[in-house]
Amino acid sequence: MQLAFVLYKYFPYGGLQRDFMRIALECQRRGHAIRVYTPIWEGAVPPGFDVRVAPIKAFHNHRRNEKFSAWLAADLARDPVDRVVGFNKMPGLDVYYAADGCYEDKAQTLRNPLYRLFKRYRHFAEYERAVFAPAAHTEILMISEVQQPLFVKH
């Protein structure tokens, strides 16, 4: 199978990044072809990996994420894969590795209500729903049992 792994930034020392690398290398060892999509790649590329760095720029993270998602969708339409595995919340994933906590829970409980009026909030809430909404049909790999009820609640 051709697998696409998607993450917003790869650098060799992050926890999410180490999890991604471990999983991708194991999939490769089992005979799958590995393609990686990211706007930022720092470090060596493992032999056999097809790393595609998105040529995008934006001042705000949420705008960069939107541009990256559009670029990713266009590239996958031109050159499809069997499964898309994401390590950050975004539309179009077949599988999501839940390394981050529930954004909506943090926005509702830890932020001022005015926070929810801003584009940044709307973006991240929408991307979380794109993964966790029942209509999304995304397979979720939870690494924290504590977070699961929060995702279900929101």
Can you describe what each PLM-predicted range is?
Residues 71-99, 140-141:
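Short N-terminal targeting/anchoring amphipathic segment
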Residues 58-84, 121-130:
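An amphipathic, basic-hydrophobic alpha-helix
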Residues 7-13, 26-63, 75:
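N-terminal strand-loop element at the rim of the active site
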Residues 41-42, 90-91, 146-148:
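Alpha-helix capping/helix-boundary segments
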Residues 120-143, 148-149:
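Membrane-proximal helix-turn-helix segments that form the acceptor-binding/catalytic region
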Residues 15-22:
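Conserved alpha-helical elements of sugar-nucleotide-dependent glycosyltransferases
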Residues 1-3:
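Extreme N-terminal starter segment of soluble prokaryotic enzymes
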